[in-house]
Amino acid sequence: MQEHLVVTLDGKDYLVEPGTNLLEFIKSQDTFVPSICYNESMGPIQTCDTCTVEIDGKIERSCSTVIDRPMTVNTVNNDVKDAQKEALDRILEKHMLYCTVCDYNNGDCEIHNTMDAWGLQHQTYEYKEKPYEKDYGPFYRYDPNQCILCGRCVEACQDIELNETIRIDWDREHPRVIWDNDVPINESSCVSCGQCATVCPCNAMMEVNMEGNAGYMTDTEPGSLAAMIDLTKKAEPGYGPLFAISDSEAEMRKERIKKTKTVCTYCGVGCSFEVWTKDREILKVQPSHDSPANKIATCVKGKFSWGHINSDQRLTKPLVRKNGEFHEVEWDEALNVIADNFTSIKEKHGPDALSFISSSKATNEESYLMQKLARQVIGTNNVDNCSRYCQAPATKGLFRTVGHGGDSGSIEDLEKAAMSVLIGTNTAEAHPVIASRMKRAQKLFGQKIHVFDIRKHEMAERADRFYQPKPGTDLAWLSAVTKYIIDHDLHDKAFIEEWVEDFDEYYKSLETFTMAFAEEATGIPEAELIKFAEECAKAESVVICWAMGITQQDIGSDSSTAISNLLLVTGNYRRPGTGAYPLRGHNNVQGCSDIGSMPDKITGYQSIEADDIRAKFEKEYGVKLNPKAGKDNHEMVEGIHDGQIHSLYLYGEDTGIVDSNINFVQAAFEKLDFMVVQDEFLTFTATYADVVLPASPSLEKDGTFTNTERRIQRLYQALKPLGDSKPDWKIFQAIANKLSFDWNYKHPSEIMDEIARLTPLYAGVSYERLEGFNSLQWPVHPDGTDEPILYLEGFNFDNGKAKLFPLSFDNYFKQDEVYDIHVNNGRLLEHFHEGNMTYQTPMLKYKVPRAFVEISPELAEDRGIHEGAEVKLISETGEAVLQVHVTDRVKGKEIYIPLNNDAMENGDLGAINLLTNSDVDQYTDTPSYKRTSCRMEVITKRGKSPLNPNNFRVNKKRHPQYSVQVQKKWERPDYVFPGNQVDK
């Protein structure tokens, strides 16, 4: 095979690797070629024709040319320049240049920059207005009269995000971008990911918040704006002066528009991007090709849900309860109240009478200081975080089998896999950017997707095969599939021999897991499971993703273990496109656990009960540490009821809504002697507190987050804290110092340096190595090298071998005669968790105003109810009143309740956890949220739908196609390739 090819570029020879994109190669040599429709994250679209060059004497598009032979390329001769000018003129026929008074004139308009760099002075074809008005969606708008039909938005929607809503209607007299079958944006299947606005090269597709806000002269009335445009064009005889003026105005904007790199504060994908702010106003969020987890992708929350930052419900002063009511006080008074109460409770009841709950929304550095406050200052290990509610069982299963509690590869590996298996994960709504990667791999590259879930969500609809097991029975089919693979000699014997131990004992434990047994337990036909087993064993590479549908069961740890067992038996670790992916739910739930906010583990999962580990931290902290493991979240609540816990300090966590059996939890709060809540808002939980401290959200501080793929990323402060609110790390430091300790951190980087000193998993992490969009995936070695794929040098056990873990199953699902309905629950795309942050963005509240219950058509018919009916759901622990949405996403007596009940407005009204019980996974104390049953009472039989009629779930269908279908443009009678117009 030839290693390099000779490419002669403008008279100079280069050695180039075969398969290189010609346009990318030309750019790499600092040679300018216009390329308006090309985007490095999307590849060639071939609509603009501006990138024409001469290849071996023929004018061709460089963007779609792959270097597969020696070639001679010319970018500067007259024929090339004539072809390029023709293409540029055609663009200006569709797009009016009024840069100085355009909101997009911020230095990154690709039409402006291309025309300027090319040196275009006059356009040949007069601009032609099109017979269309602007179309406004909730978050972005489309201006057909500025659209050049480059098709980037179509490519992004169809083949990057895979929402499959946008296309270009090439058959019109005046082609334009349309949504679905030509409906307004707000009536379409659009999910508002915003990627169309991200990739648009001009002002045709733009964020609503930008319009009238970005420029010095763009906030005028439309008529005045048009007059200014005409005046500007008349005053400037050539584009050179126009560009000079607009460039000066763009430079002025830099003084007031700040662009700050940050990391999304919602789910665990870890999307990074620049946030554009003007004073405190958030204009837009702009991801980058350099964003390591997401590239140019976003979801509706990361792109648009920032209303919480400037919400009028933000806390700006500390609150102290006096005579039963909250009063605003200065910081010193609030800190004194906390210090006095902590001291008196510790003196009276001992340090273990105090407890601390850390936040998965806060930074690594802040989570570290919370556990340090508990352990060093107070002397207790009663510290935990919300991974207890969701991810602890997955971590347990991985610790048992492979030794690290995190994703075994990167998000890229989810794209590379030949087969993806999704179990108990509503990925398209809970981790939408990850789902897009998988949807793309399936659509464009043939990845096979298998989904096991009790509910038919989007990924189930798209799956090559969809299986619906009975609730809580996944362990049965996982183990039966593994047994079948071994029984039929389909297991990876070489991998097992070299890298796995305990095979014989494990195989014996599978004796009862026959396919017949699995069919009886799960309801999945034996033939389907056999076919799956054979496909899984024979696939070149397999990844398994799972989430709360697995972990929030009373056998969550064992089911997670069964997943890893299957991967080991089939040899699906230690290679690209393979491995275990417990998709983390919060932006920093991985990091919060990594960094030691756990009752039995300090940083890097080092045991607090190990003498040598404690000795290391005692030397750093200057105190003796408590050698006894503390209480987890579940045990804290029980400890309050039992009189063992007298104080609770939690931050960034609405425990009174999100914990299971919240009637029991709220009753515990009322028994506390002293409670501190630290948050952006006066949350439902905060209403029980004695002191409420105003905390700053992510845009108001520096720090790091660790995402689901173990990726550590920096976020930078974009705004000053609102009012007297403070970053959490500063609050913890102030409390520690009030309690006579001498914490003196000047910046979160100093906290990370301390973490790195104490934590082998983070040993090489530093802010310098995380500068900008740089990132590291733990374990990070002292020299700064990291491990995007785990276990390449062996598994995380002393002998380097993984361990197969024997399991048993007796967790049969049984329908209760009284509580005859099974209650499933989870996230919606538009909201996050209880919705405290997302409901502060009005258009998200408009899309999904309140919580509701999904009911199957057959259950609705059985109970005589219709869309919008009001029902009371009653379980053994409580009751909730909700409106009904009838949908075939659920079947039979399965119902689904989203987590978001807008608790700050509604309290616990309609909260799912009024129905859940206190049962837990025996190994991790994770509540079995998904193991809930209820009965139903009908209040009204029909009513107004709980969903906005413009919500994409309401009778909206996707319209998939491949790319922009540029061949339809080329087939139009009015199209001629510019290269063919060049007079030879």
From Swiss-Prot:
Residues 252-984 are annotated as: Formate dehydrogenase. Signal peptide: none annotated. Residues 257-313 form the 4Fe-4S Mo/W bis-MGD-type domain. Residues 79-119 form the 4Fe-4S His(Cys)3-ligated-type domain. [4Fe-4S] cluster 4 binds at C264, C267, C271, C299. It comes from the Bacteria. Binds 1 [2Fe-2S] cluster. GO terms for cellular component: membrane. GO terms for molecular function: 2 iron, 2 sulfur cluster binding; 4 iron, 4 sulfur cluster binding; formate dehydrogenase (NAD+) activity; metal ion binding; molybdopterin cofactor binding; NADH dehydrogenase activity. Its cofactor is [2Fe-2S] cluster; [4Fe-4S] cluster; Mo-bis(molybdopterin guanine dinucleotide). It is an enzyme of class 1 (oxidoreductase). Its EC number is 1.17.1.9. The keyword Membrane does not apply. GO terms for biological process: formate metabolic process; respiratory electron transport chain. [2Fe-2S] cluster binds at C37, C48, C51, C63. Residues 3-79 form the 2Fe-2S ferredoxin-type domain. Pfam families: Fer2_4, Fer4_7, Molybdop_Fe4S4, Molybdopterin, Molydop_binding, NADH-G_4Fe-4S_3. Residues 138-165, 181-211 form the 4Fe-4S ferredoxin-type domain. InterPro entries: 2Fe-2S_ferredoxin-like_sf, 2Fe-2S_ferredoxin-type, 4Fe4S_Fe-S-bd, 4Fe4S_Fe_S_CS, Asp_de-COase-like_dom_sf, Formate_Dh-H_N, Formate_DH_asu, MoPterin_dinucl-bd_dom. It catalyses: formate + NAD(+) = CO2 + NADH. [4Fe-4S] cluster 2 binds at C147, C150, C153, C200. [4Fe-4S] cluster 3 binds at C157, C190, C193, C196. In the C-terminal section; belongs to the prokaryotic molybdopterin-containing oxidoreductase family. This is Putative formate dehydrogenase SAR2393. It comes from Staphylococcus aureus (strain MRSA252).
